Amino acid sequence: MVSSETFKSCVWLSAAFVLAVAWAVPAAAKPQNPADLCIGAVAKQEAAHGIPRHLLRAISIAESGRWLRSRKATLAWPWTVTSGGKGTYYKSKSAAMRAVRKLQRRGVRNIDVGCMQVNLRYHPKAFKSLGQAFDPRANAAYAAGFLRKLRDDKRSWTQAVKHYHSATRSLNRPYHAKVYKIWRGERRKARKIQIANNRLQRQQARARFQHKRAERLLADNRFAARSQLWLDRASKRLFKQ
């Protein structure tokens, strides 16, 4: 028969496996947060243009960063419009586009838009339409290409970041300091996430091993139980004789 201690051990090992697998299963899908549009688009363009990891992300946060209480973080916001030094975060792409058109009807041309706050006055040919300007993929792609060109021209990522904002030294030096502070923070967070992921993978591997061990123990004990049952029946037949 299966001993109570062995049975408890098998149950515990199986439970550990189920718990580890549950950690790895994503929660039910939720509506995508607009900030995630910037995150995905920026990460893709960093890789495509050979930009140091998280640097373009840091610039996006410096440009259109918005504190999100639900995420407890400042993240780039795709529906951001800045004019006259004042940035406004809109709830939707359509609302942001209406705001830009309203500014343009008033004769305002110096307007920054989207995740990377591309300036419509200084980059008039960047996008085919205002709708494309607010497309996070197109916005990040143009900004990444512009930053890469600055890097190639200036031979320095430091200078590229400065000139992404302005060629004026008194303006670009504080901007560079701000971006690099954000960049250091983003790299620290990325390292912590990687460490946590590695730990989770080890826990899952350990749980899988324990689950297989539990299955073997259960199989062995089922065989032992069947053998014991056969012996009991054989003994009864012998006694009857």
Report each predicted region and the residues it spans.
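N-terminal secretory targeting signals
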Residues: 1-50, 181-241
